[in-house]
C-alpha cells in the first residue's frame, strides 16, 4: 500500500492492454516506406499459401487455413471458416480478428462472401457469418 506522498510523487500508472490481433493495428505508408499505427477492423490481403493443419491435442480434424500477405506487408495465418472453400494462391481475401482456439498461431479469420472468397454453399442458418445469400 503506497503512502500519500508516494502517490503524489509517482502517481498511478494505467495498465497497458496488448492487442489480440496486432497485424490489424498498422498500415503501410509506401511513400515513406514505413509502418504507421492505424488500427482497422478488417484488412485486405493476398493468399500466399492455402492448406490444412491438425488441431491441438484433444481434437482431431483437418482445419483449413491460408497464409495471407496483408496490404500493410505483414504476413499472417488466417482460418477459413465453413465447409468447403474456393481459395487458392493469389486469391484476394478480407481478414478480421478472432483466434481459433485449437490452432496455435492462428489469430485471424477470413471473411466469407467478401472479395474473392465465396460464401458457403447450401447454408440455411447463420448465413450472415458465412456470406451465403438468401435462396
Swiss-Prot record:
Residues 1-20 are annotated as: Disordered. GO terms for molecular function: rRNA binding; structural constituent of ribosome; tRNA binding. It comes from the Bacteria. Residues 9-18 have a biased composition (Basic residues). The keyword Nuclease does not apply. GO terms for biological process: translation. Keywords: Ribonucleoprotein, Ribosomal protein, RNA-binding, rRNA-binding, tRNA-binding. InterPro entries: NA-bd_OB-fold, Ribosomal_uS12, Ribosomal_uS12_bac. GO terms for cellular component: small ribosomal subunit. The keyword Ribonucleoprotein applies. Belongs to the universal ribosomal protein uS12 family. Part of the 30S ribosomal subunit. Contacts proteins S8 and S17. May interact with IF1 in the 30S initiation complex. With S4 and S5 plays an important role in translational accuracy. NCBIfam families: rpsL_bact. This is Small ribosomal subunit protein uS12. It comes from Lactobacillus acidophilus (strain ATCC 700396 / NCK56 / N2 / NCFM). The gene is rpsL.
Amino acid at each position: 500500500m503506497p503512502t500519500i506522498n508516494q502517490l503524489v510523487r509517482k502517481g498511478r500508472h494505467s495498465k497497458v492492454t496488448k492487442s489480440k490481433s496486432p497485424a490489424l493495428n498498422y498500415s503501410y505508408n509506401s511513400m515513406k516506406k514505413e509502418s504507421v499505427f492505424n488500427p482497422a477492423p478488417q484488412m485486405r490481403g493476398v493468399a500466399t499459401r492455402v492448406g490444412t493443419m491438425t488441431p491441438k491435442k484433444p481434437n482431431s480434424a483437418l482445419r483449413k487455413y491460408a497464409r495471407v500477405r496483408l496490404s500493410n506487408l505483414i504476413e499472417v495465418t488466417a482460418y477459413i471458416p465453413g465447409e468447403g472453400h474456393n481459395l487458392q494462391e493469389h486469391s484476394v481475401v478480407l481478414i478480421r480478428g478472432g483466434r481459433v482456439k485449437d490452432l496455435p498461431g492462428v489469430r485471424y479469420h477470413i471473411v466469407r462472401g467478401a472479395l474473392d472468397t465465396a460464401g458457403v454453399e447450401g447454408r440455411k442458418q447463420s448465413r450472415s457469418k458465412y456470406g451465403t445469400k438468401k435462396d
